[in-house]
């Protein structure tokens, strides 16, 4: 148990691990829809300058493993944040997810994409996927604890 000032506890035993796993599954489903050949993948692939071979194909096991791990870490962090923010409704959880996305994900990606020379189009595509995940994670974890 990690205890911070004002008695905010980060107690892993209070996490609903089934809800976290559901968030990870939702994230994978969202990503597969978001980056589907019929949705944003062709535009994203063109903007990143991709060739005929798709990204990550040389080591798909590691790519997917780290993707699932990243989603798991996000869901666990969101579980702690909705508890710390006292979010107990779908609306308050969704707003918590939105504010975390708006305050941390969107600006971080913006700086990274601009300095990498990728511009706003790829930024918008990539952060949109995370926006959906964060709002759903916040809403779900607020009511399913």
Where are these regions (language model features)?
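Juxtamembrane/disordered regions of integral membrane proteins
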Residues: 7-145
